[in-house]
Amino acid sequence: MTGLINPSGFVLACPGSGKSFLVKREIADVFLRNANADILVIDPEREYWKLAEAFNGTVVKFSNGSKSYINPFDFDIALLDDEEVDVIADKCQLITSFISCMDSKHPLNAQEKSFVDRCVRKAYIRSGVLDTLDPADMPTLETFLDCMKKETENINKDMKDKLIVTIDMYVNGSAKYFNNRTNIDTDNRFISYDIRDLNGNLKTQSMLLILDYIWNRLSRNRDLGRATYIYFDEAHLLFADEYALDYLRMLWKRARKYGGVLTGITQNVEDLLKDDKSRSMLSNSEYLALLKQNPTDAAKLQDILHFTDSEIQYVNDTPPGHGILVLGGKDKIPFYDEFPRDTELYSKITTNFSETAKMLEAKAE
């Protein structure tokens, strides 16, 4: 993929078609071949921990009861000197997306977005971090909530009270997990962010915050001359929310300049295709790995990607591991991923339940 103008892309497949195996095989290949690359995985289903541990990576588990935290307001101080980035504006967009995910059925209107934007900016000013440049002075959701409560200029009281009630749950209520300072270790070159134990909107919000946190890693790695490979499984969770999708698109556009390669992985192709923004991300991706698709999705993909009838057959009713690569938007390469099963690496990347059970049984003997 190094020869592609923008190597970010997608892995799309039905359940049981070899999607996770293909991705983990690629991760292993990147890790072993490129010592100057970091690998970061957002793992909603706890599928990557064995591979991470095999390579002495770090698995960071997020849940309501865990002690691993990411502060939504955190950012790399060095970004303040980056002329290509308005880090505070980006944070305003992130927090707007974060709040939108709290109730995706009722997106923020223009007045609410303006209010949130104003309070985010005031939270950074009030915390003092823009003067001290000390990460310990970063604002938190509690700082943000306090700014909301004290804001009185040109405010609709009903709107303000509604947002305060919503945010209060994330500061003092059941979702206060997000009202903490970042404390995770990110020095390892292979990190898997495990969010399986988070449910519903909390999972989507965590994916959003982790992507933003990874953006900080991208910034540091660019200065170090290191590549950053980012894999986010269950990508359709981000497509369901307009603001989360907008934030993802922003990262997608910037990643290449920072040495980043983003790979979205999903079995819900329909969610990817139903929105013009995500369809645009798909059609403009220079790397696509397609395995078995259901007939409806295959027909839609054929239309968007201009497959011939013979080319689309490589994803119609095919065995696991069979598919087609689309590189540079035009080159289509059929593949069959046949991996030797009597190896230690295979045991770390297979997701076949019966095979895993047999391996555990043999190990016990």
Language model regions located:
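Short acidic loop-to-helix transition motifs that present clustered carboxylates
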Residues: I5, R46, V269-L272, P295-T296
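Charge-patterned, long linear interaction tracts outside catalytic cores
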Residues: L4-G9, A13, E26, V116-K149, ...
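Glycine-rich phosphate-binding loop of nucleotide-binding enzymes
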Residues: M1-N64
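C-terminal regions of RecA-like/P-loop NTPase motor modules
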Residues: C14-P15, L272-E365
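H-loop/switch region of ABC-family ATPase nucleotide-binding domains
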Residues: T266
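Hydrophobic "anchor" residues on beta-strands that sit immediately upstream
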Residues: I39, Y229, T263
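P-loop NTPase motor domains
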Residues: T2, R46-T58, N64-S66, N71-G260, ...
